[in-house]
């Protein structure tokens, strides 16, 4: 019944297996990839005809982690997988980015790639396995795909690169100072196509070395996919790239000068209007047959690309008149929103971000339910890109894949410089509102986020800045590297290369390459040029932070105290009774973890002190020989019980009440009476022994021996 083909190899410390022919046989291509005991199934289907009038490539990538893969049942009311999590969205983008440029130009049939995590060993991250499975499924499906690709994750510890470090090693790099890198690289046999990383101030040489190491390590995986395809690949889809050379010649003749004049306008809004008008004039000058040609959009885009790119390599000029390595004018302002905890407005040319920081307590941490376990995050970064930022009308709703991806890039860049939670026990939420956009808005979020957190009083290890780089690579090998690219330069260039970091090194690197031929030398030069741009931006940012910002008066204060773990139950009380009383009486928030660390939070310092004193009274031990003020709570024939230390009671024996014989303790005491007592010690059973007669009941001072003898 089944015609199963399996290919296996040793990859690093694990075994990698590719299998096809048993499951989902009606899909155009299905491969189950397994690394260790982590398995991902990738399914590829594609339409045999292009939709009429479609002028873009409709590729859709879905990635889903099934809870059963790790032996778990989903939470929530419905107990089933619902909308994609942030991890699933980011992984789908991770797969999409390297495969999209490898489809044959002109192919616009709908393609669907679905990756499903079937098994997770909690050691090997399924995102790399999914990328390999998707590449293999595309390669055997017959779709016009110029792959295969493969991906690998690289760590960096003690000066050594590590292939595919475990999930635990990568879980929270901020708390694991030995592990300084989480880098994912995808590429073909000959070229790197995509880089995504989180780093801890690594040098340009160390980052480039990691990329090179990863590209070397994926070579045997690509060979394994090719070996699988040689035996199982379907007949290639009969597709011939459209020849629109005659149409392009007509478009070029009709409007090259108009398009060149339009792109010479430096103001974005005016340029967009002029480019649109030039296109309308070009279309109007064409024949009716040419106007109805489905490749007209491609011909116009090619003309734009030629005009935009021509001056970059030949003359070193860009559409806004800047030099290739020149950063746009920068303006920074902090503290502009009075009631927020921290705020910054970062403007670079026609790109602007209003970034706001809010400080919260442990109750505000984000709870993340993942396949490899549940955990909390105390640093959140949310990126919003409303339509008005580019002068358009559009949908407003929940964040899309792009917003989630850009927010995560900025998160990676900034979290490397955050203080340790033990030093700064706050939850930090940064929100970047992109108010204007003309390229590299994610890097504006990095710069604005750094300024905003410092304005809020967050003790960052160092300021962070980011810059977006571009590349124009001609067929003869000549190239131009662009610093701080515009939106048009991003769309029509050959590489999008975002670098963020401090003066000391890189904290985040993201690279998407659209063409082959990007050599290590080009990447090295691009990183060097990016460093110069980053240092320039850091210098501009420093002008707005002449002195350390004070902690916002509107932010909660957090006091941390450590209690013995065996005292935690006493602080919480039966059914939470004690801790609820502390919160109600003091007005402060109280958070206790299993290690005995208690965080007390309030904007009111008196509330914090009240809660601190109440907790201290519960967990502190009375000191032998010390004098305390107490209250009589019960009188018995042999003495009186006095509450003297929080909830702790002790016995004052009738012989320790006064220096004379009493018939009954009630002769001098009554319940509710305030008295001064000295802790004499503890009896054999641990019971507290108190004395009143050795303490002056008026002053609270201990009666010295001489005075007692005189009496």
From Swiss-Prot:
Location of the protein in the cell: Cytoplasm
SMART domains referenced in this protein's UniProt entry, alphabetically: KH, S1
Protein's UniProt keywords contain Disulfide bond: no
Catalytic activity: RNA(n+1) + phosphate = RNA(n) + a ribonucleoside 5'-diphosphate
Residues of the S1 motif domain: 625-693
Residues in KH domain copies: 556-615
Cofactor list: Mg(2+)
Keyword flag Metal-binding: yes
Name the record gives this protein: Polyribonucleotide nucleotidyltransferase
